[in-house]
Every structure is written in structure tokens, then in C-alpha cells.
Amino acid sequence: MKIHVLGSSAGGGFPQWNCNCPNCAAYRQGSPHLLERTQSSIAISGDDANWVLFNASPDILQQIKSFAKFQPNPVQALRDTAIRAIFLIDAQIDHTTGLYMLREHRQPLELWCHALVHDDLVTGNPVLNVLAHYCGIHWHDVPLTQSGFAMDGVPGLHFTALPLISNAPPYSPHRDQPQPGDNVGVTVVDTQSGKTLFYAPGLGEMEAHVWAAMQAADCVLVDGTLWTDDEMITLGASGKTSRAMGHLPQSGAGGMLEWLDQLPSSTRKILIHINNTNPLLDASSPQRHELTRRGIEVSYDGMDIDL
């Protein structure tokens, strides 16, 4: 299984266009310890030729330009792409706006998402209605069953979606009232090697079924949004805690680091969806050194993971 990190930042990217937090300010002043990051998205393939795009960020065009395997093959059709399917884990703006940029597709987009996500994308944020006037979509409802599913045109991979406690977008009727399917994590299994990835960029609470999936995975690529629960409040950037926004903080009791420390030593542990305010973005910070000590990696745009 090939996994390519297209974007590693939370919504807004890094640096965020209107932000003067210590990280964004230091980046603009030329700090060598901070990398530019686009908004969260990954690509997965079982054969290195047919790919699934997980989430379509507002930065999708830049991400495609940076990833040759997503670019049109000159020996194929005039209009070509290796993206065989798109999987949306939720209906958030930073995971769906990129769909507009894919409207030139020659056939309907093969779109996989839960019915609740689909509902939000034809009502509160009706991007799918707009796309009906362009390429259109072929929607596949993502089941929340242990048996999982395969995708046509994506050989060698099997997918299982797990409901997560996180938060729906502000335009959803389920905002602050989580419903199973608003947000999902995904287990992806390479059917030849048996290797398993668990992917959950938005994880607000650790439940038994989620923890079991993480323990069974060879690699976990999980929520790294904020370092402390009150990070945004302390900076004056928001009045909400990390958990209230649907993200487990890294530090503190019951935080992501405590959970990752309990995984088998053989498990590869990687953080993604990192907010611009998070001090771990600074490679010279005590927080980054703490992650290194614990054997936890920080994803970056262009990172490749082989399982």
C-alpha cells in the first residue's frame, strides 16, 4: 500500500492567511524550523497506479501539481487522472471545497461518503448540487459495518469506516450533536500484504471500537490538531477548547499522546491535520522534541508511507 500525504495542516493551512500567532509570524520572518503546509488530504493506492483521494481540500490544485502520479498520463486520454475515487470523511469546508476544482472531470466523480455527509453537501453546503451542472457525481453510501467494502477501479485495498465522536460543520443540523457518520475514521487493508492503516484526522474522543482499530493497525495517521485543550483560548484565537471543536488535544490527561504511548512498539505513529497555532510545527520546539522522544512522527506535505 502506498500512502502519500498531500496536505498535513488543519483548515486554513500554514501559515494561515490572516494569522499572526507565534508560528505564522516566525514563518514569515524566515524561520528555518517551520515548513509551509497545505490543508489536510492524503492519497492511497494498492498498486501505485489507481488512487483514492481522501478529502478534497481547497489546496487540491497545488497538491496535484506537487504529486506527479495525480497528473495526466501523456500516453492516455487527452483528459486523464489516476484518481479513481474520492472518500470524504466529513463535510467540513477544508475537506470538500476542492471538489469544485475537479469539475472538469470527464465522467461523474466516484464519491464515497456517509449519508449524513451527503445530506450536508446537498443542503447546508450544496457543492454536490453545483457539480451536477458540471461533471456530476456518482455517490456511494459508506456503510458503518465491520465487513467493510471495496471500491471498483481500486484493486488491492479493502476499506472499513468507523463512526467517530467529533463535530459536524457549522452549517450542519448536527452541529454540537454528533451523529454516527458525521465523521468517520477509516481502516485500509492491503489485501496482499495484510498491512493496515488507520486514518482519523478528526478524532474528538477515544471510543472502544476506535481504540481496537488503532491497536490492530500497522500505522496510525491521526489527529494532531492542537497541543493543549485551551490552546486557541489562550492565544485569543477562539473561545472554544480543542475537544469542543471535535479534536483530542495532544497533551494532558486522556490526550492523544497518552493513547499513542500505549500502542505496540511496532506501530508507526504519525500526526496529521495540525493547526497553525500548534507549537509542534516548530521543529526546534520542546513539543517536537517530546514527540521524537516518544517515537511519534509529524507528517508533512509530500510525505510517502509504504505499508
Regions found by a protein language model. Give the residues of each.
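Extreme N-terminal starter segment of soluble prokaryotic enzymes
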Residues: 1-4
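Active-site-proximal loop/helix segment associated with metal-binding centers of metalloenzymes
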Residues: 12-39, 143-242
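Pre-active-site segment of Zn-dependent metallo-hydrolases
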Residues: 15-91, 97-104, 206-213
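Active-site neighborhood of phospho(di)ester-bond hydrolases with catalytic His/Asp-centered motifs
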Residues: 53-57, 82-94, 113-114, 198-203, ...
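A short alpha->loop->secondary-structure connector
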Residues: 71-81, 105-107, 127-141, 148
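Short, well-ordered alpha-helix to beta-strand connector turns
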Residues: 83, 108-109, 134, 216-218, ...
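A short, active-site helix/loop in glycosyltransferases that binds the activated sugar's phosphate group
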Residues: 116-126
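Cap/insert and terminal regions of metallo-dependent hydrolase folds
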Residues: 181-183, 192-196, 204-302
